[in-house]
Amino acid sequence: MSGVPTPPPPGEMSSGPVAESWCYTQVKVVKFSYMWTINNFSFCREEMGEVLKSSTFSSGPNDKMKWCLRVNPKGLDDESKDYLSLYLLLVSCPKSEVRAKFKFSLLNAKREETKAMESQRAYRFVQGKDWGFKKFIRRDFLLDEANGLLPDDKLTLFCEVSVVQDSVNISGQSNMNMLKVPECQLSDDLGNLWECSRFTDCSLYVGGQEFKAHKSILAARSPVFNAMFEHEMEESKKNRVDISDVEPEVFKEMMGFIYTGKAPNLEKMADSLLAAADKYALERLKVMCEEALCNSLSVENVADTLILADLHSAEQLKAQAIDFINRCSVLRQLGCKDGKNWNSNHATDIMETAGWKSMIQSHPHLVAEAFRALASAQCPHFGLPRKRLKQS
């Protein structure tokens, strides 16, 4: 989704004519995508005009505008009987109408987009109205195995939607003598203070290594350090903190984040850094670690990641790990190869990994949570046919 509109930068306003007042109009556009896989496509409805519908989808959980895809496997009418027809349908909408552009494509055996067709303009949708292509792709071309569009008899459709939202205006007065304000260097300055150990007033000992720091900065950034130095604790009296459950390289990365808000080596140590961030109540760093771990989920590590998320109350990571497990389970039932890398050539079962077997023994409640989520997951539904199928 496009963000809050900003006025034109000074460079644009100072080149060429400059007016005393100006207005900047931002047309907001919400973009989202949807993937629909139809298993055993060759068994789909064979009569012209018969329809198959996807489940409903939207741009996000808070979006009340619901869409679905509608496909006619053997065309919509006599003109398109040798084609597959594909449409985008507005199922429900809180507004009287909405304008949207769309793009359809097929995913081939290599999971690459092909045979893309895009609307040339933003069409006007009202509830129950659909737009699309009567002649999206010829059936004989689609069914030809040499073209690789139905791997394992699965048709995968990919749809990208761009919904036009309300426009926003920002206006103001021009300043003929604009000054360029230098970028803030606070992060770099504090980083240098940490790297050079200047004006430090406390020492932190981790794994036999000493790290000199500034109590005021530690207290300002971490509620845990704040409590440690604020009260008459041993660390506050001696200006010394002994830390035994964090590796030195992980601690150094955490301290760099405390001073600069950056963690350049986060990807290499996201699991250990998440534990340290949780211990010292560094919420932003914790979520950054969750994001990195979400992006690296795999069949082999998802069980260990789920345990880590549960141990450190990383709720977003926990939800993503459970969702990954469930998607793998559903896709395996449908005959897909691998839950995350759908184009993988090997069918690895999460439940056969050492991490999963260990989790059954040490954290059985997580196994129960994963299965409860799987049981409550919604499955795609098919639309009713317009005609009865011929019986063979």
From Swiss-Prot:
Residues 200-267 form the BTB domain. It is found in: Nucleus. Residues 31-161 form the MATH domain. Keywords: Nucleus, Ubl conjugation pathway. Pathway: Protein modification; protein ubiquitination. Gene3D superfamilies: 6.10.250.3030, 6.20.250.50, Apoptosis, Tumor Necrosis Factor Receptor Associated Protein 2, Chain A (2.60.210.10), Potassium Channel Kv1.1, Chain A (3.30.710.10). GO terms for molecular function: ubiquitin protein ligase binding. Disulfide bonds: none annotated. One of its GO terms (cellular component) is nucleus. It comes from the Eukaryota. The keyword Acyltransferase does not apply. GO terms for biological process: negative regulation of protein ubiquitination; proteasome-mediated ubiquitin-dependent protein catabolic process; protein ubiquitination; regulation of proteolysis. Component of a cullin-RING-based BCR (BTB-CUL3-RBX1) E3 ubiquitin-protein ligase complex that mediates the ubiquitination and subsequent proteasomal degradation of target proteins, but with relatively low efficiency. This is Speckle-type POZ protein-like A. It comes from Danio rerio.
